[in-house]
Amino acid sequence: MQVSVETVSNLQRRMTVQVPSERIEQEVDRRLKSLARRVKIDGFRPGKVPLKVVQQRYGAGVFQEVVGEVLQSSYQEALLQEKLEPAGSPSIEPKPLEPGKGLEYTATFDVFPKVEIADLSDVAVERPRVEVSDADVDKVIETLRRQRKEFVAVDRAAQKGDQVIVDFDGSLDGEAFEGGKGEAMPVELGEGRMLAAFEDQLNGMKPGDEKTIDVPFPEDYPAENLKGKTAQFAIKVREVKEPTLPEVDEAFAKSFGIEEGGVEKLREDVRANMEREVAQALKAKVKDQVMQALFKAHPLELPEALVKDEIERLRQQALSRFGGQVKPENFPDEVFREEAVRRVSLGLIIRELVASKGMKVDAGRVKAELEAMAAGYEDPRQVIDYYRNNRQAQSGLEAMVLEDQVVDFVVEQGKATDKPMSFDELMNPRKEGASE
């Protein structure tokens, strides 16, 4: 077999492969002889069909079958011979087959770019350092209390935090509209679940009060017939209820499934959960910095096939999140290209780092990661058994751990500094430009 390779561009290769006719002819002959021993043709005893008859009836089909298989196998052999790794499927153009001549074709494909790992000593990483305090636990307990709040009817004017039970009947230019009417609807003032203009005008109303209010709809309101319009609502307050929070006692702890240990056990569980959240957030923050640094330090020319494949994966993920309510054409390639380029680049960079540094996945870390993940579930053993009995899930976990090892390696090579911060600063970072 003869192979020649032409460099079309930095990443594109055109490989010409010539397969001797003997390879095809010998395989065709072998299959026809095997067929002659098994085939049944009228007028001939089983196993006694002349090879010439078998060739006349089945020769063309067997020939095409062999040519297809030889093309595929010779393509793989040629790649190994030339030490080429294609990125994506090739475009194959076979030359017309002539009697007595071998198979010849060209395969055009992109190859993976050569990745040269940059000097990582200047990679700056800021590692948050967080201790979960008693005050942090108190805040979470208070949030849990609010989640268990109950509303009790009061005979006074409604104020922020109250729940108002209201009837309303809306109209636009004197005409009723879809969704504009409700009875005994609970509206919690300050939650923002209703239009602000509607909610604000419930403040100060008492049980039994009635009035008609104007409510302007924003320009970006989903319903076309209401965008930018002002509707009138006749409203009547049935009840005003104020929130009451449960006491933090043994009964409160039991409401979260804690049968023994009471409030102290609840606080222990809350702290343990917060510390797991901190560990995950710390890892995510460091990883994000490392990935940004690696991407910036390794500008790559990428095979378009890989980028397109990643774009399609991202598009399918987006479509599944919308549950089929959005059409694929609403997500053009441009929406995902930047993220696809980043992901493909980082995949190639990490692959080269792992190969060049001889990294192997740490089985101990895989075990520890699995146990940490399982600890957050009601039945940790069920989670552990699932991963151990599911090869695909296990492989995904191992890939994640290996990526974590890469992050640790980069941090060790670079310049890492510790930054003390509170639990709230870590878990609820303020966006740049946020108002004081």
Swiss-Prot record:
Its EC number is 5.2.1.8. The keyword Nucleotide-binding does not apply. Residues 161-246 form the PPIase FKBP-type domain. It comes from the Bacteria. It is an enzyme of class 5 (isomerase). Keywords: Cell cycle, Cell division, Chaperone, Cytoplasm, Isomerase, Rotamase. PROSITE patterns: FKBP_PPIASE. It catalyses: [protein]-peptidylproline (omega=180) = [protein]-peptidylproline (omega=0). It is found in: Cytoplasm. GO terms for biological process: 'de novo' cotranslational protein folding; cell division; chaperone-mediated protein folding; protein transport; protein unfolding. GO terms for molecular function: peptidyl-prolyl cis-trans isomerase activity; protein folding chaperone; ribosome binding. GO terms for cellular component: cytoplasm. Involved in protein export. Acts as a chaperone by maintaining the newly synthesized protein in an open conformation. Functions as a peptidyl-prolyl cis-trans isomerase. Belongs to the FKBP-type PPIase family. Tig subfamily. Consists of 3 domains; the N-terminus binds the ribosome, the middle domain has PPIase activity, while the C-terminus has intrinsic chaperone activity on its own. This is Trigger factor. It comes from Thioalkalivibrio sulfidiphilus (strain HL-EbGR7). The gene is tig.
